[in-house]
């Protein structure tokens, strides 16, 4: 879908933000769920587009005990299986916040658990706190491509999939 975003206009010009782009979305209300959706997306990236699975890294929601929202272990297990089918080991790493990522780093991981600022979808600014009651919202999963460029420590001590150094998109 064609997307124009102005909510993060102040970030345009960094390694990841533009105002207009085409976004691949995969939405369903009851027709299919994580198992099918994640497989279709992985197959699209690796078989149709031809991306090497060794260059792909994924993020999932870490959960929020206070809000009563569980860690998305289901998506992590699906991703683990998909990578295994391609011969790629998929270690899980709990990051938490983006700032935690600059301390914890990659740790040889492939599947990373982030908080609601990174892996929670809603119609507004991503966060459990900004989600209006009754609105469609929930944990999401994102895929990052590793360009294998050296980490620029000006962005933080350690690199991680949500790092802005340019290694991942």
Feature roles, as predicted:
Residues 1-169:
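Structured aminoacyl-transfer and RNA-binding surfaces used for tRNA recognition/handling
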């Amino acid at each position: 879908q064609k997307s124009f975003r102005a909510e993060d206009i102040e970030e345009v010009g960094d390694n990841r933000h533009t105002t207009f782009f085409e976004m691949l979305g995969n939405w369903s209300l009851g027709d299919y769920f994580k198992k099918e959706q994640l497989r279709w997306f992985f197959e699209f990236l690796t078989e149709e587009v031809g991306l090497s699975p060794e260059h792909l890294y994924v993020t999932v929601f870490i959960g929020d005990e206070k809000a009563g929202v569980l860690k998305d272990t289901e998506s992590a297990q699906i991703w683990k299986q998909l990578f295994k089918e391609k011969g790629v080991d998929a270690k899980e790493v709990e990051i938490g916040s983006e700032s935690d990522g600059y301390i914890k780093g990659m740790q040889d991981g492939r599947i990373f658990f982030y908080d609601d600022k990174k892996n929670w979808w809603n119609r507004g600014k991503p966060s459990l706190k900004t989600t209006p009651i009754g609105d469609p919202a929930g944990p999401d999963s994102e895929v990052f491509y590793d360009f294998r460029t050296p980490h620029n420590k000006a962005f933080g001590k350690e690199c991680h999939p949500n790092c802005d150094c340019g290694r991942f998109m």
